[in-house]
Protein backbone atom coordinates (compact mmCIF):
# COMPACT_ATOMS: atom_id res chain seq x y z
CA UNK A 1 0.00 0.00 0.00
CA UNK A 2 2.87 2.38 0.79
CA UNK A 3 4.30 1.87 -2.69
CA UNK A 4 0.89 2.52 -4.24
CA UNK A 5 0.50 5.81 -2.34
CA UNK A 6 4.00 6.89 -3.34
CA UNK A 7 3.30 6.09 -7.01
CA UNK A 8 0.05 8.08 -6.94
CA UNK A 9 1.73 11.04 -5.22
CA UNK A 10 4.64 10.94 -7.67
CA UNK A 11 2.17 10.85 -10.56
CA UNK A 12 0.25 13.80 -9.14
CA UNK A 13 3.44 15.82 -8.73
CA UNK A 14 4.63 15.11 -12.28
CA UNK A 15 1.13 15.73 -13.63
CA UNK A 16 0.96 19.17 -11.98
CA UNK A 17 4.41 20.19 -13.22
CA UNK A 18 3.64 18.91 -16.72
CA UNK A 19 0.42 20.90 -16.81
CA UNK A 20 1.94 24.13 -15.49
CA UNK A 21 5.03 24.18 -17.72
CA UNK A 22 4.48 24.37 -21.50
CA UNK A 23 7.96 22.99 -22.22
CA UNK A 24 7.03 19.59 -20.78
CA UNK A 25 4.91 17.54 -23.20
CA UNK A 26 2.01 15.38 -22.04
CA UNK A 27 3.94 12.17 -22.78
CA UNK A 28 6.66 13.02 -20.23
CA UNK A 29 4.93 10.71 -17.71
CA UNK A 30 5.41 7.41 -19.54
CA UNK A 31 8.79 8.69 -20.76
CA UNK A 32 10.00 8.89 -17.13
CA UNK A 33 8.93 5.28 -16.61
CA UNK A 34 11.79 4.07 -18.82
CA UNK A 35 14.09 4.61 -15.83
CA UNK A 36 11.97 2.60 -13.40
CA UNK A 37 10.04 0.00 -15.42
CA UNK A 38 12.27 -2.89 -14.33
CA UNK A 39 11.38 -2.41 -10.67
CA UNK A 40 7.67 -1.61 -11.10
CA UNK A 41 4.83 -4.03 -11.76
CA UNK A 42 2.21 -3.35 -14.44
CA UNK A 43 -0.37 -1.77 -12.14
CA UNK A 44 2.14 0.82 -10.96
CA UNK A 45 3.14 1.65 -14.54
CA UNK A 46 -0.48 2.14 -15.60
CA UNK A 47 -1.39 4.15 -12.51
CA UNK A 48 1.56 6.52 -12.86
CA UNK A 49 0.90 7.03 -16.58
CA UNK A 50 -2.84 7.75 -16.31
CA UNK A 51 -2.44 9.92 -13.21
CA UNK A 52 0.19 12.07 -14.95
CA UNK A 53 -1.78 12.59 -18.19
CA UNK A 54 -4.93 13.45 -16.23
CA UNK A 55 -3.07 15.99 -14.11
CA UNK A 56 -1.46 17.61 -17.13
CA UNK A 57 -4.92 18.47 -18.46
CA UNK A 58 -6.25 19.64 -15.07
CA UNK A 59 -3.38 22.04 -14.52
CA UNK A 60 -2.90 23.01 -18.14
CA UNK A 61 -6.09 25.05 -17.82
CA UNK A 62 -4.88 26.63 -14.57
CA UNK A 63 -1.70 27.83 -16.29
CA UNK A 64 -3.58 29.13 -19.33
CA UNK A 65 -6.34 30.98 -17.48
CA UNK A 66 -4.07 32.60 -14.87
CA UNK A 67 -1.06 33.56 -17.00
CA UNK A 68 -2.18 33.03 -20.62
CA UNK A 69 0.68 30.56 -21.03
CA UNK A 70 -0.76 27.37 -22.57
CA UNK A 71 0.23 24.68 -20.08
CA UNK A 72 -0.60 21.99 -22.63
CA UNK A 73 -1.01 22.01 -26.38
CA UNK A 74 -4.78 21.55 -26.44
CA UNK A 75 -5.22 24.89 -24.59
CA UNK A 76 -4.03 26.79 -27.67
CA UNK A 77 -7.47 26.42 -29.21
CA UNK A 78 -9.05 28.94 -26.82
CA UNK A 79 -6.10 31.16 -25.88
CA UNK A 80 -7.39 34.27 -27.67
CA UNK A 81 -10.84 33.96 -26.07
CA UNK A 82 -9.33 34.83 -22.68
CA UNK A 83 -8.75 38.41 -23.88
CA UNK A 84 -12.51 38.97 -24.03
CA UNK A 85 -13.32 37.70 -20.54
CA UNK A 86 -13.65 39.81 -17.42
CA UNK A 87 -11.77 39.07 -14.21
CA UNK A 88 -14.88 37.56 -12.62
CA UNK A 89 -15.46 35.35 -15.65
CA UNK A 90 -11.91 34.05 -15.51
CA UNK A 91 -12.29 33.36 -11.79
CA UNK A 92 -15.43 31.35 -12.52
CA UNK A 93 -13.60 29.54 -15.32
CA UNK A 94 -11.06 28.13 -12.87
CA UNK A 95 -13.88 26.49 -10.96
CA UNK A 96 -15.94 25.38 -13.95
CA UNK A 97 -13.03 23.82 -15.81
CA UNK A 98 -12.03 21.97 -12.62
CA UNK A 99 -15.57 20.59 -12.20
CA UNK A 100 -15.77 19.70 -15.88
CA UNK A 101 -12.40 17.96 -15.70
CA UNK A 102 -13.46 15.98 -12.62
CA UNK A 103 -16.73 14.82 -14.19
CA UNK A 104 -15.02 13.97 -17.48
CA UNK A 105 -12.23 12.11 -15.72
CA UNK A 106 -14.59 9.98 -13.63
CA UNK A 107 -16.91 9.28 -16.58
CA UNK A 108 -14.07 8.24 -18.88
CA UNK A 109 -12.53 6.05 -16.17
CA UNK A 110 -15.86 4.25 -15.73
CA UNK A 111 -16.20 3.95 -19.52
CA UNK A 112 -12.71 2.51 -19.83
CA UNK A 113 -13.27 0.02 -17.02
CA UNK A 114 -16.68 -1.17 -18.24
CA UNK A 115 -15.62 -1.35 -21.89
CA UNK A 116 -12.65 -3.55 -21.02
CA UNK A 117 -14.95 -6.00 -19.20
CA UNK A 118 -16.62 -6.76 -22.53
CA UNK A 119 -14.03 -5.92 -25.18
CA UNK A 120 -11.42 -8.55 -24.38
CA UNK A 121 -10.06 -11.80 -25.79
CA UNK A 122 -12.16 -14.02 -23.51
CA UNK A 123 -15.46 -12.53 -24.64
CA UNK A 124 -14.43 -11.75 -28.22
CA UNK A 125 -11.84 -14.32 -29.35
CA UNK A 126 -11.96 -13.03 -32.95
CA UNK A 127 -9.94 -10.03 -31.75
CA UNK A 128 -6.81 -12.17 -32.06
CA UNK A 129 -7.57 -13.35 -35.61
CA UNK A 130 -5.34 -12.30 -38.50
CA UNK A 131 -8.29 -10.82 -40.42
CA UNK A 132 -9.36 -8.55 -37.57
CA UNK A 133 -5.83 -7.41 -36.80
CA UNK A 134 -5.11 -6.61 -40.45
CA UNK A 135 -8.28 -4.52 -40.70
CA UNK A 136 -7.53 -2.78 -37.39
CA UNK A 137 -3.91 -1.94 -38.18
CA UNK A 138 -4.70 -0.92 -41.76
CA UNK A 139 -7.36 1.53 -40.57
CA UNK A 140 -4.91 2.93 -38.03
CA UNK A 141 -2.17 3.34 -40.64
CA UNK A 142 -4.61 5.03 -43.01
CA UNK A 143 -5.79 7.40 -40.28
CA UNK A 144 -2.18 8.43 -39.56
CA UNK A 145 -2.09 9.95 -43.05
CA UNK A 146 -4.72 12.48 -41.98
CA UNK A 147 -3.13 13.72 -38.76
CA UNK A 148 -1.56 16.80 -40.35
CA UNK A 149 -2.57 16.28 -43.99
CA UNK A 150 1.11 15.93 -44.92
CA UNK A 151 0.64 12.79 -46.96
CA UNK A 152 4.10 12.58 -48.56
CA UNK A 153 6.03 13.14 -45.31
CA UNK A 154 3.76 10.73 -43.46
CA UNK A 155 4.36 8.02 -46.06
CA UNK A 156 8.12 8.60 -45.84
CA UNK A 157 7.99 8.35 -42.04
CA UNK A 158 6.01 5.11 -42.25
CA UNK A 159 8.57 3.66 -44.68
CA UNK A 160 11.47 4.76 -42.46
CA UNK A 161 9.79 3.21 -39.43
CA UNK A 162 9.32 -0.08 -41.25
CA UNK A 163 12.93 -0.03 -42.43
CA UNK A 164 14.54 0.44 -39.01
CA UNK A 165 12.04 -1.33 -36.76
CA UNK A 166 13.35 -4.38 -34.87
CA UNK A 167 13.04 -7.47 -37.07
CA UNK A 168 12.91 -10.64 -35.02
CA UNK A 169 10.65 -12.59 -37.37
CA UNK A 170 12.58 -14.72 -39.83
CA UNK A 171 9.59 -14.94 -42.16
CA UNK A 172 10.70 -11.46 -43.26
CA UNK A 173 13.07 -11.22 -46.23
CA UNK A 174 16.79 -10.62 -45.66
CA UNK A 175 16.58 -7.14 -47.24
CA UNK A 176 14.89 -5.82 -44.11
CA UNK A 177 17.74 -7.06 -41.94
CA UNK A 178 20.34 -5.42 -44.20
CA UNK A 179 18.64 -2.02 -43.94
CA UNK A 180 18.41 -2.41 -40.19
CA UNK A 181 22.19 -2.67 -39.83
CA UNK A 182 22.53 1.00 -40.85
CA UNK A 183 20.85 1.94 -37.57
CA UNK A 184 22.47 -0.72 -35.42
CA UNK A 185 22.55 0.28 -31.76
CA UNK A 186 19.61 2.66 -31.60
CA UNK A 187 16.89 2.32 -28.96
CA UNK A 188 13.30 3.50 -28.95
CA UNK A 189 14.23 5.78 -26.05
CA UNK A 190 16.86 7.41 -28.30
CA UNK A 191 14.26 7.90 -31.04
CA UNK A 192 11.92 9.57 -28.55
CA UNK A 193 14.71 11.89 -27.41
CA UNK A 194 15.61 12.79 -30.98
CA UNK A 195 12.25 13.26 -32.65
CA UNK A 196 10.16 14.56 -29.72
CA UNK A 197 12.08 15.79 -26.67
CA UNK A 198 15.18 17.58 -28.05
CA UNK A 199 13.21 19.51 -30.75
CA UNK A 200 11.34 21.20 -27.87
CA UNK A 201 14.55 23.19 -27.28
CA UNK A 202 13.97 24.96 -30.57
CA UNK A 203 10.44 26.08 -29.70
CA UNK A 204 10.12 29.79 -29.07
CA UNK A 205 8.14 30.62 -25.94
CA UNK A 206 6.30 33.92 -25.71
CA UNK A 207 7.99 36.07 -23.09
CA UNK A 208 5.00 38.40 -22.67
CA UNK A 209 2.94 36.88 -19.88
CA UNK A 210 0.35 38.19 -17.49
CA UNK A 211 -0.14 37.27 -13.88
CA UNK A 212 -3.23 38.84 -12.39
CA UNK A 213 -2.86 38.44 -8.63
CA UNK A 214 -6.60 39.03 -8.25
CA UNK A 215 -7.17 35.54 -9.66
CA UNK A 216 -5.94 33.93 -6.45
CA UNK A 217 -9.55 33.48 -5.36
CA UNK A 218 -11.83 31.48 -7.64
CA UNK A 219 -15.55 32.11 -8.06
CA UNK A 220 -17.97 29.22 -7.95
CA UNK A 221 -19.96 29.83 -11.11
CA UNK A 222 -22.97 27.79 -12.24
CA UNK A 223 -21.99 24.59 -14.02
CA UNK A 224 -23.71 23.84 -17.34
CA UNK A 225 -24.25 20.11 -16.85
CA UNK A 226 -25.56 19.56 -20.39
CA UNK A 227 -22.43 21.16 -21.83
CA UNK A 228 -20.25 19.11 -19.49
CA UNK A 229 -21.97 15.85 -20.46
CA UNK A 230 -21.79 16.60 -24.19
CA UNK A 231 -18.11 17.55 -24.01
CA UNK A 232 -17.30 14.47 -21.95
CA UNK A 233 -18.86 12.21 -24.59
CA UNK A 234 -17.07 14.05 -27.40
CA UNK A 235 -13.80 13.59 -25.52
CA UNK A 236 -14.44 9.88 -24.98
CA UNK A 237 -15.03 9.41 -28.71
CA UNK A 238 -12.07 11.61 -29.72
CA UNK A 239 -9.81 9.61 -27.42
CA UNK A 240 -10.39 6.54 -29.59
CA UNK A 241 -9.15 8.29 -32.76
CA UNK A 242 -5.45 7.83 -33.65
CA UNK A 243 -3.41 10.99 -33.24
CA UNK A 244 -3.10 13.75 -30.61
CA UNK A 245 -6.17 12.80 -28.57
CA UNK A 246 -6.30 15.82 -26.24
CA UNK A 247 -5.95 18.37 -29.03
CA UNK A 248 -8.50 16.59 -31.23
CA UNK A 249 -10.99 16.49 -28.36
CA UNK A 250 -10.47 20.16 -27.47
CA UNK A 251 -10.91 21.36 -31.05
CA UNK A 252 -14.00 19.19 -31.56
CA UNK A 253 -15.70 20.37 -28.35
CA UNK A 254 -14.66 24.00 -28.93
CA UNK A 255 -16.04 24.17 -32.46
CA UNK A 256 -19.33 22.47 -31.58
CA UNK A 257 -20.10 24.91 -28.75
CA UNK A 258 -21.88 28.08 -29.85
CA UNK A 259 -23.01 29.61 -26.55
CA UNK A 260 -20.11 31.99 -25.95
CA UNK A 261 -16.37 32.09 -25.29
CA UNK A 262 -16.66 30.98 -21.68
CA UNK A 263 -18.65 27.85 -22.55
CA UNK A 264 -16.27 27.04 -25.41
CA UNK A 265 -13.33 27.06 -22.99
CA UNK A 266 -15.13 24.84 -20.47
CA UNK A 267 -16.11 22.46 -23.26
CA UNK A 268 -12.55 22.22 -24.59
CA UNK A 269 -11.04 21.55 -21.16
CA UNK A 270 -13.71 19.00 -20.27
CA UNK A 271 -13.25 17.07 -23.51
CA UNK A 272 -9.48 16.82 -23.34
CA UNK A 273 -9.64 15.31 -19.86
CA UNK A 274 -11.83 12.42 -20.96
CA UNK A 275 -9.82 11.84 -24.15
CA UNK A 276 -6.47 11.28 -22.41
CA UNK A 277 -8.01 8.42 -20.43
CA UNK A 278 -10.05 6.69 -23.15
CA UNK A 279 -7.08 6.69 -25.54
CA UNK A 280 -5.83 3.81 -23.37
CA UNK A 281 -8.71 1.58 -24.52
CA UNK A 282 -7.23 0.45 -27.89
CA UNK A 283 -3.92 -0.28 -26.17
CA UNK A 284 -5.41 -2.27 -23.31
CA UNK A 285 -8.03 -4.06 -25.44
CA UNK A 286 -6.13 -4.74 -28.68
CA UNK A 287 -2.48 -3.91 -27.85
CA UNK A 288 -2.89 -1.08 -30.38
CA UNK A 289 -1.14 2.23 -29.51
CA UNK A 290 -2.71 5.28 -31.18
CA UNK A 291 -0.72 8.26 -29.87
CA UNK A 292 2.65 9.15 -28.32
CA UNK A 293 1.56 8.20 -24.81
CA UNK A 294 0.26 4.78 -25.74
CA UNK A 295 3.21 4.10 -28.06
CA UNK A 296 5.61 4.59 -25.17
CA UNK A 297 3.49 2.41 -22.89
CA UNK A 298 3.33 -0.25 -25.61
CA UNK A 299 7.12 -0.26 -25.80
CA UNK A 300 7.39 -0.52 -22.01
CA UNK A 301 5.04 -3.50 -22.09
CA UNK A 302 7.23 -5.12 -24.75
CA UNK A 303 10.32 -4.55 -22.60
CA UNK A 304 8.57 -6.37 -19.76
CA UNK A 305 7.26 -9.09 -22.13
CA UNK A 306 3.66 -8.27 -21.24
CA UNK A 307 0.61 -8.76 -23.46
CA UNK A 308 -1.59 -6.00 -22.10
CA UNK A 309 -5.06 -7.32 -23.16
CA UNK A 310 -4.59 -10.31 -20.86
CA UNK A 311 -2.13 -8.87 -18.31
CA UNK A 312 -4.61 -6.26 -17.04
CA UNK A 313 -6.92 -9.03 -15.79
CA UNK A 314 -4.25 -10.75 -13.72
CA UNK A 315 -4.22 -10.32 -9.95
CA UNK A 316 -2.47 -7.23 -8.62
CA UNK A 317 -0.52 -6.85 -5.38
CA UNK A 318 -3.90 -6.28 -3.69
CA UNK A 319 -4.87 -9.94 -3.83
CA UNK A 320 -8.33 -10.38 -5.34
CA UNK A 321 -8.22 -7.04 -7.18
CA UNK A 322 -6.98 -7.23 -10.75
CA UNK A 323 -4.48 -4.84 -12.31
CA UNK A 324 -7.38 -3.06 -14.02
CA UNK A 325 -9.35 -2.80 -10.75
CA UNK A 326 -6.55 -1.16 -8.77
CA UNK A 327 -5.69 1.14 -11.68
CA UNK A 328 -9.27 2.42 -11.97
CA UNK A 329 -9.58 2.94 -8.20
CA UNK A 330 -6.25 4.78 -7.95
CA UNK A 331 -7.00 6.99 -10.95
CA UNK A 332 -10.40 7.95 -9.55
CA UNK A 333 -8.86 8.88 -6.19
CA UNK A 334 -6.23 11.04 -7.91
CA UNK A 335 -8.93 12.91 -9.85
CA UNK A 336 -10.48 14.14 -6.58
CA UNK A 337 -7.03 15.23 -5.36
CA UNK A 338 -6.49 17.12 -8.62
CA UNK A 339 -9.87 18.81 -8.28
CA UNK A 340 -9.00 20.06 -4.80
CA UNK A 341 -5.50 21.21 -5.75
CA UNK A 342 -6.63 22.91 -8.97
CA UNK A 343 -9.14 25.04 -7.06
CA UNK A 344 -6.72 26.10 -4.33
CA UNK A 345 -3.26 27.72 -4.16
CA UNK A 346 -3.92 29.47 -7.49
CA UNK A 347 -1.58 32.35 -6.65
CA UNK A 348 1.25 29.92 -5.88
CA UNK A 349 0.86 28.16 -9.23
CA UNK A 350 0.83 31.45 -11.14
CA UNK A 351 3.98 32.71 -9.40
CA UNK A 352 5.73 29.39 -10.07
CA UNK A 353 4.89 29.58 -13.77
CA UNK A 354 6.08 33.18 -14.06
CA UNK A 355 9.33 32.50 -12.19
CA UNK A 356 10.21 29.50 -14.35
CA UNK A 357 8.98 30.91 -17.65
CA UNK A 358 11.99 33.17 -18.18
CA UNK A 359 14.28 30.20 -17.48
CA UNK A 360 12.36 27.74 -19.68
CA UNK A 361 15.24 27.12 -22.08
CA UNK A 362 17.65 26.43 -19.22
CA UNK A 363 15.13 24.08 -17.60
CA UNK A 364 14.70 22.16 -20.85
CA UNK A 365 18.45 22.00 -21.56
CA UNK A 366 19.02 20.62 -18.07
CA UNK A 367 16.27 18.02 -18.46
CA UNK A 368 17.53 16.93 -21.88
CA UNK A 369 21.15 16.72 -20.67
CA UNK A 370 20.15 14.45 -17.79
CA UNK A 371 18.04 12.23 -20.07
CA UNK A 372 20.85 11.87 -22.62
CA UNK A 373 23.42 11.18 -19.89
CA UNK A 374 21.37 8.40 -18.32
CA UNK A 375 20.53 6.82 -21.69
CA UNK A 376 24.16 7.00 -22.82
CA UNK A 377 25.29 5.36 -19.58
CA UNK A 378 22.97 2.38 -20.16
CA UNK A 379 23.39 2.18 -23.96
CA UNK A 380 24.95 -0.94 -25.45
CA UNK A 381 26.99 0.97 -28.04
CA UNK A 382 29.97 3.32 -28.27
CA UNK A 383 29.71 7.01 -27.42
CA UNK A 384 30.48 8.00 -31.02
CA UNK A 385 27.86 5.63 -32.42
CA UNK A 386 25.28 6.78 -29.87
CA UNK A 387 25.81 10.49 -30.52
CA UNK A 388 25.81 9.95 -34.29
CA UNK A 389 22.48 8.11 -34.21
CA UNK A 390 21.02 10.65 -31.78
CA UNK A 391 22.11 13.48 -34.11
CA UNK A 392 20.36 11.75 -37.04
CA UNK A 393 17.09 11.34 -35.14
CA UNK A 394 17.32 14.88 -33.75
CA UNK A 395 17.77 16.26 -37.27
CA UNK A 396 14.66 14.37 -38.34
CA UNK A 397 12.78 15.64 -35.27
CA UNK A 398 13.73 19.29 -35.78
CA UNK A 399 12.79 19.06 -39.46
CA UNK A 400 9.39 17.58 -38.56
CA UNK A 401 8.88 20.27 -35.92
CA UNK A 402 9.40 23.12 -38.35
CA UNK A 403 7.38 21.38 -41.07
CA UNK A 404 4.58 20.82 -38.54
CA UNK A 405 4.57 17.08 -39.23
CA UNK A 406 3.69 14.63 -36.45
CA UNK A 407 6.36 11.99 -35.69
CA UNK A 408 3.59 9.56 -34.68
CA UNK A 409 3.69 7.49 -37.93
CA UNK A 410 7.43 6.92 -37.46
CA UNK A 411 7.03 5.85 -33.83
CA UNK A 412 4.03 3.65 -34.66
CA UNK A 413 5.85 1.67 -37.34
CA UNK A 414 9.06 1.38 -35.31
CA UNK A 415 7.10 -0.20 -32.46
CA UNK A 416 4.84 -2.40 -34.60
CA UNK A 417 6.83 -2.78 -37.83
CA UNK A 418 7.80 -6.40 -37.22
CA UNK A 419 4.23 -7.40 -36.42
CA UNK A 420 2.74 -5.45 -39.33
CA UNK A 421 5.10 -6.96 -41.90
CA UNK A 422 4.42 -10.44 -40.52
CA UNK A 423 0.63 -9.88 -40.63
CA UNK A 424 0.66 -8.67 -44.21
CA UNK A 425 2.94 -11.53 -45.30
CA UNK A 426 0.59 -14.05 -43.70
CA UNK A 427 -2.42 -12.40 -45.31
CA UNK A 428 -0.73 -12.53 -48.70
CA UNK A 429 0.03 -16.24 -48.31
CA UNK A 430 -3.50 -17.02 -47.10
CA UNK A 431 -5.55 -15.03 -49.57
CA UNK A 432 -3.42 -14.68 -52.72
Where are these regions (language model features)?
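Transmembrane alpha-helix interface/packing and boundary motifs in multi-pass membrane proteins
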Residues: 10-26, 56-68, 142-147, 232-242, ...
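Short helix-coil transition sites and intra-membrane helix breaks within transmembrane domains
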Residues: 17-27, 65-76, 238-248, 268-273, ...
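Re-entrant/interfacial helical elements at transmembrane boundaries that shape
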Residues: 26-36, 64-84, 114, 159, ...
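Alpha-helical transmembrane segments of multi-pass membrane proteins
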Residues: 14, 91-104, 226, 230, ...
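Membrane-embedded alpha-helical segments of transport systems
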Residues: 54-59, 96-112, 266-306, 333-337, ...
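Membrane-embedded alpha-helical modules
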Residues: 97-206, 305-432
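Helix-loop-helix hairpins and the membrane-proximal interhelical loops
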Residues: 1-43, 121-126, 174-260, 368-379, ...
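Membrane-interface alpha-helices at helix entry/exit sites of multi-pass transporters
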Residues: 42-47, 81-103, 258-268, 404-405
Amino acid sequence: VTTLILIILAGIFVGIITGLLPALPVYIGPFILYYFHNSLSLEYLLIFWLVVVSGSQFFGSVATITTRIPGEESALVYLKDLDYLTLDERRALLYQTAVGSLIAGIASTVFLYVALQYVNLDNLPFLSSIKFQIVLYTITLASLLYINKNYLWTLLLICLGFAISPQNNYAITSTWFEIKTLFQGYTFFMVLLGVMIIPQLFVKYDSSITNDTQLNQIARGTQNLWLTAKSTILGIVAGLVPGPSATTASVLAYKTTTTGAKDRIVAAETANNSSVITCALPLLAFALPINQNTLIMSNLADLKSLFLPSAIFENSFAGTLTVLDITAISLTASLFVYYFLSTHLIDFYAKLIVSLHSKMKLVMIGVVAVLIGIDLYTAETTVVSYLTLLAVFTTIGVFLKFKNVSPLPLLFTIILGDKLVWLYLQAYKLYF
